[in-house]
Amino acid sequence: MERKYVIGLDYGTLSGRAIIADCKDGTVLASAVKEYDHGVMSEYLPDGTELTGTGWALQNPKDYIDVLKYIIPEAVAQSGVSSKDIIGIGLDFTSCTMLPVDENNVPLCLLVKNVSRPHAWVKLWKHHGAQKLSLIHI
């Protein structure tokens, strides 16, 4: 019987990781890691918009795709297994990572009209930059 393998993906606070594991005994054959190009955005958005106040912990969803395009091929190459023998993928994100999307599942921050709007970007678990409500109108 041919051996089968799975890919494990972990998106952390500063980087993404992939492993290739043997389905039969869980042995990890290879792993790959790549840091996010934008890291955690706590002072500025990619377009230079300053994040005023404190508690910002934002990420760029493009980083998740860039990481994915690197770590999977790298881990598969290191493992020496054939991609046809990989039968599943498991995915994990850090705690409660919030990604606002539109009705077509496009991240709001990737729409031109929202690039300078901090609340359109991915919110990390440690984000505390919510705007305080000063007036309530009923």
Regions found by a protein language model. Name each.
Residues 119-135:
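Glycine-rich phosphate-binding loop plus the immediately following alpha-helix
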Residues 109-123:
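A mobile, often basic/glycine-rich helix-loop segment
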Residues 1-111, 136:
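N-terminal glycine/serine-rich phosphate-binding loop of ATP-dependent small-molecule kinases
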